[in-house]
Amino acid sequence: MEKRGNFGTELGMILATAGGAVGLGNVWRFPYMTGENGGAAFILVYICCVLMLGIPCMLSEFIIGRHGASNTYRAYSLLSGGNAWKYVGLLGVATGFLIMGYYAVVSGWCLQYVYASFFGELTGNADFVNHYFAEFSSDPWRPVIWTLAILVITCLVIVNGVRSGIERTSKMLMPTLFILLLVIVVASCLLPGGERGMEFLFKPDFTKLDSDAFLGALGQSFYSLSIAMGCICTYAFYFKRQTNLLKSALQVSLLDTLIAVLAGLMIFPAAFSVGVNPGSGPSLVFVTLPNVFNQAFAAVPLVGMLVSVFFYALLSLAAITSLMSLHEVSTAFLIEELHITRRTAATFVTAGSLLIGIFCSLSFSDIPWLSFGGRTLFDWFDFVTGQIFLPVGGFLTCLFIGWAVPRKLVRDEFTNWGTVSCRVFGVYLFFVRYVCPTAILAVFLHQLGVF
């Protein structure tokens, strides 16, 4: 078995972990939820949810991963003494692998749109852009080629290991992502009428904070930090023993939230400057925003082209950092459980993800057996992993760390064996035992339409 690596610097560790959390949902979900649910009032609720749910869940996975010093499955197995709790770790590995398969498809779309933006293929009216996306996504070959491309890029990073691959790449990609984001934010906010978008995003309206808004904030705080995918636990495997887990969780959460808010500043001023309600989801990114950029920067087409290229490059970088963390979950599992080299494990994971990606991509075409029950195969992967596996895994992880793992072990990891202040340990344990499981259960039932 290959020698275990670790992160060489605290900055590299934070950027890699934050890169795993920052993804396409920060762009196509959080800004719209914020604008529709009271602006700054929703952001305040969301921050409270991150503190009450996201950070305790992340801390729990940090503790399991660092103490277990193994892949996610083995870490749960070691802490549980090999009993049934180990299957929660196996669920995390499986969830991360399945998500990677269909997430790579959308990530490939981002790469295609970088190419299309640069060569002017997205120039046209709203109907043209909508037709372009429908034609591209249903094509049997082009999306698969781009899916393969982004998986190969990810694989090349993973093959180089933790320090030379994941950490070094994160140190390059995350600052680049942030710079591109700031450039587009400035360009968007300077547009005539852009202030209406900023008002929509930030003006507090507490009358919109109903039960759906609270549950939406809870769900977003859980999903946005990549909880229960195995990513957090696997990266904690590479933490140094002196890493302050609470401080790291706070820093990762802050970066993730900051990027999500900046994404709103990137989207809404441009959309409102041309009178478009941007909406959410993939249609926002691949249909609405190309049209918005075409209209908003019509007077200076070169600027519009650059903004579009930068935007999809930004999305591609966010997708790659997320895919890196998802890939490493399964790669670390195969290395330790099958005693194979990193190169071989990474190749197997890439091949398996590509197979899933091919079928998910083809489900957008007219192949009848890839759509059933009112959903495409892509939608089924999204539904099963996002609305069942993730909340179940998060719920069980909270019960595991809160009740099954010895309190002293949890306290020792939380406080770095007494070298870090433990004044909030009791608060953390209370939340992970009672508040987090209740919140996750509420989100789970709400998503299934129970209430």
Regions inferred by a protein language model and the residue ranges of each:
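Transmembrane helix-boundary motif of multi-pass solute transporters/channels
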Residues: 12-49, 236, 247-250, 254-257, ...
